[in-house]
Amino acid sequence: MDDNKRKSLDAALKSLDKTFGKGTILRLGDKEVEKIDSIPTGSVGLDLALGIGGVPKGRIIEIYGPESSGKTTLTLHIIAECQKKGGVCAFIDAEHALDVKYAKDLGVDTENLYISQPDFGEQALEIVETIARSGAIDLIVVDSVAALTPKAEIEGDMGDQHVGLQARLMSQALRELTGIVHKMNTTVIFINQIRMKIGMMGYGTPETTTGGNALKFYSSVRLDVRKTATLKQNDEPIGNRVKVKVAKNKVAPPFKQAEFDVMFGEGVSREGELIDYGVKLDIIDKSGAWFSYKASKLGQGRENAKAFLKENPAIADEITQAIQNSIGIDSMILGAKEDDEGDE
């Protein structure tokens, strides 16, 4: 660059710094690439699939899927993990359906969880924006986009047409919210539901999410949550097998998948993931229906092996450490306790 151009650029940069603050625009080579902070999801496999050890901080996240697929359970685990690291969380319960006892069973500190049950969509999104601007909240969960009903629709008569009203509401809110959450390093998770496209024929998926296309565009990460099987013991349902696909990822390579068990009343099964990864990495030996680790017989059948690990946390921690060493990821991803002990 010649001297005249450089002088003109320097003058423009100084003017921008004076008007908008220092660091408004920087040359990429002069700025170190920042490591993206993350919040663990409570699932080893999903943290790995996301590529950075969890959901990114300071970004908008969409978690969507059919009903009863495990979306809210996953977000409650993320809240619990955020609180373990000293984070402050808020839950915008637009569906008015939060089960406080279940949240507590999953490890959520409900005493210190901020909750709001808004009456209409505009109020919910205004609450999200206000608490995000405060800079004091680390994680905000909105459950769900489908329940963010515009005020005009609530106050209108049954049968009135309100075409595109919710989509416009989401688009306007997200335009403002994206910059705020990035600046304040606040993560906002929107839970969304699946709908079938009307009159869909030919190629392409017949499914879509509610609230228009704005959330798809502004989300840094989109997680597609699906139930693949019902887990049974003695013919009694005890949980679901869940598959999560990273449908969009702006912070790491997308399209990776993770599968894990979600047990009724307990949430994501850590022991189930230890068995899955242990067998995959030859840390746990599987011979027929029997699982064993070193000299210890874990049990016959997967559920018995999971029960053994739950009753023997020392062996579970040892397997966790072995998996960690084998994969070469830090303790944050596997939810080990070293980070917490180091902070004290």
UniProtKB/Swiss-Prot annotation:
Question: Which InterPro entries does the annotation name?
Answer: AAA+_ATPase (IPR003593), DNA_recomb/repair_RecA (IPR013765), DNA_recomb/repair_RecA_CS (IPR020584), P-loop_NTPase (IPR027417), RecA-like_C (IPR049261), RecA-like_N (IPR049428), RecA_ATP-bd (IPR020588), RecA_C_sf (IPR023400)
Its biological purpose is as follows: Can catalyze the hydrolysis of ATP in the presence of single-stranded DNA, the ATP-dependent uptake of single-stranded DNA by duplex DNA, and the ATP-dependent hybridization of homologous single-stranded DNAs. It interacts with LexA causing its activation and leading to its autocatalytic cleavage.
Q: Provide the GO biological process annotations.
A: DNA recombination; DNA repair; SOS response
Summarize the impact of residue 219 to A: In strain: NCTC 12894
Keywords, comma-separated and alphabetical: ATP-binding, Cytoplasm, DNA damage, DNA recombination, DNA repair, DNA-binding, Nucleotide-binding, SOS response
Matching entries from Gene3D superfamilies are given as:
P-loop containing nucleotide triphosphate hydrolases
All disulfide bonds of the chain are none
> What GO molecular function annotations does the UniProt record carry, in alphabetical order?
ATP binding; ATP hydrolysis activity; ATP-dependent DNA damage sensor activity; damaged DNA binding; single-stranded DNA binding
State the PROSITE patterns in the record: RECA_1 (PS00321), RECA_2 (PS50162), RECA_3 (PS50163)
Name the family the entry cites: Belongs to the RecA family.
Binding residues annotated for ATP, in chain numbering: 65-72
Which superkingdom heads the taxonomic lineage of this protein's source? Bacteria
Compartments where located: Cytoplasm
Q: Just give the chief location class.
A: cytoplasm
Q: Which PANTHER family match?
A: MITOCHONDRIAL DNA REPAIR PROTEIN RECA HOMOLOG-RELATED, RECA
What Pfam families would the database entry show? Answer: RecA, RecA_C
Q: Which GO terms describe its cellular component?
A: cytosol
SMART domains annotated for this entry? AAA
Query: Where does the record place a coiled coil?
Result: none
Is rRNA processing one of the keywords?
Answer: no
Q: What is the effect of changing residue 176 to K?
A: In strain: NCTC 12894
* Keyword match DNA-binding: yes
* Chain's gene name: recA
Q: What is this protein called?
A: Protein RecA
